Curated annotation (Swiss-Prot):
Disulfide bond annotation, renumbered to this chain: none
Name of the protein this chain belongs to: Bifunctional protein FolD
Species whose genome carries this gene: Pseudothermotoga lettingae (strain ATCC BAA-301 / DSM 14385 / NBRC 107922 / TMO)
Taxonomic path: Bacteria, Thermotogati, Thermotogota, Thermotogae, Thermotogales
GO MF: methenyltetrahydrofolate cyclohydrolase activity; methylenetetrahydrofolate dehydrogenase (NADP+) activity
Gene Ontology CC annotations of this record: cytosol
Binding residues annotated for NADP(+), in chain numbering: G155, R156, S157, S182, I223
Length: 273
């Protein structure tokens, strides 16, 4: 059973278009990338396509050095015509991710990577929560109630696993959350009891059908290349017994819609200042 993420993405896009009708300023998103590979370039092009389809101005800045990246981020943070800043990841080896994240104006941090926004998340403020975690929670709350449910998150990254756990623990959601990682023993015995499973480990087909109970909701965050094709972290046979987000066309699609929605919200906030 496949979860229809396209309808959720469309719903967010419609919210964005409504915001744009009242914006006096045209929203602008600037994406930064340093020495990008073909995968990054492809993703940024899809981001650009989505932005333009919604009427959001989009600019990609391809940089050659860390110093240029830092300088350009600072300039964009100060530029009143820019409403959202995106920095493509992973960054090249040796670059301090937190150092880069701190340079982004917290109010233009549409990815939710700035440590200040991470801190706000603990107190339930999700305006700039990490965008992929936001997409995961949006999908879940669109298809089921999470209150009291046993949720297992596989992966403890700062962009998905940890923030998703915090968001699902929030009092108005009140899920019971278990986070598994590379040192967790006997993961199958844990996932078999879960009502909801979120998988973000970057390993194609990591979650098998025999690790999932019937009627569970499974959110596949993974994007991997397997035999020349895009594959998720979840074995496709899982959809025979559970509800599963597709890859591609699942979490990634909703995440991009979340990003654009934040740019539009920022522009509308600027109008009211």
């Amino acid at each position: 059973m496949i979860i229809d993420c396209r309808s959720i993405s469309k719903e967010i896009d419609e919210e964005t278009l409504k915001l744009l009708t009242i914006c006096k300023t045209k929203p602008k998103l600037v994406s930064f990338t340093i020495n990008p590979d073909s995968g990054t370039i492809s993703y940024l092009k899809s981001q650009q396509k989505k932005a333009r389809s919604l009427g959001i101005e989009y600019e990609t800045r391809v940089l050659d050095s860390v110093d240029d990246l830092k300088s350009d981020i600072l300039n964009a943070s100060k530029d009143s015509s820019v409403h959202g800043i995106f920095v493509s990841h992973p960054l090249p080896a040796g670059i301090n991710e937190m150092e880069i994240a701190k340079l982004v104006d917290p109010e233009k941090d549409i990815e939710g990577r700035n440590p200040l926004n991470m801190g706000y998340l603990i107190y339930g403020k999700e305006d700039f929560a990490p965008c992929t975690a936001t997409a995961v929670v949006r999908i879940l709350t669109s298809v089921t109630s999470v209150t009291g449910k046993q949720v297992v998150i596989i992966g403890r990254s700062t962009t998905v696993g940890q923030p998703a756990a915090i968001m699902l623990l929030r009092r108005d959601r009140s899920a019971t959350v278990t986070v598994c990682h590379s040192k967790t023993r006997d993961i199958p015995s844990i996932t078999k009891k879960a009502d909801i499973i979120i998988v973000a480990v970057g390993k194609a087909g990591f979650l098998k059908k025999d690790m999932v109970k019937e009627e569970a909701v499974v959110i596949d965050v993974g994007i991997n290349i397997l035999d020349g094709k895009i594959a998720g972290d979840v074995e496709q046979s899982v959809q025979e017994i559970a509800y599963l987000t597709p890859v591609p066309g699942g979490v990634g699609l909703v995440t991009t819609s979340v990003l654009m929605n934040r740019v539009a919200k920022n522009a509308s906030r600027g109008d009211s200042n």
